[in-house]
């Protein structure tokens, strides 16, 4: 059975001599404990010779800040001699795509169920309550700005 270890901000699992690194970001909510929420998937990847690094986070409306924090966490544990692949699920895809290096620090990205919905669509209760309270709330960057940032890379 693979052994998970916490190294700095990252949870890691993998062989002692990996063929590469998979940097994983989970979806909103599930990303708080990726070593538990995505255990079967990530351990299967590690059994195939990859060192899996997961950054855990609590969701916020500032997705750009989360993307920078995740990127810094991965960068602090970088294995310079190994190829890097980025794997994201849902909001984790968005965070990888918003990384400050614009993907230049990896050989490829696998993005599962990319979520770029607005705040009121992602959080239905917010969509119901915000108009009644006379407030408007949106992620930063919002959906249109996210697509503009991604396509300009």
Can you name each region flagged by the protein language model?
Residues 69-153:
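Serine-dependent carboxylesterase/thioesterase catalytic core
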Residues 3-60:
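Short, surface-exposed "cap/lid" segments of acyl-processing enzymes
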Residues 33-34, 63, 97, 120:
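Active-site-proximal flexible loops/turns
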Residues 34, 54-82:
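Catalytic nucleophile-loop/oxyanion-hole region of alpha/beta-hydrolase
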């Amino acid at each position: 059975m693979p052994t998970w270890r916490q190294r700095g901000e990252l949870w890691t699992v993998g062989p002692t001599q990996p063929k590469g690194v998979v940097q994983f970001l989970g979806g909103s909510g599930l990303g708080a404990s990726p070593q538990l929420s995505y255990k079967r998937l990530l351990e299967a990847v590690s059994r195939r010779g990859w060192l899996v690094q997961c950054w855990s986070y609590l969701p916020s409306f500032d997705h750009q800040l989360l993307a920078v924090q995740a990127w810094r966490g991965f960068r602090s544990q970088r294995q310079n001699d190994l190829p890097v692949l980025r794997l994201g699920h849902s909001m984790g895809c968005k965070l990888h795509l918003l990384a400050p290096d614009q993907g230049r620090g990896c050989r490829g990205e696998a993005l599962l169920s990319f979520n770029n919905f607005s705040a009121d669509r992602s959080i239905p209760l917010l969509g119901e309550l915000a108009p009644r309270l006379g407030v408007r709330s949106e992620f930063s960057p919002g959906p249109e700005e996210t697509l503009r940032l991604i396509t300009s890379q």
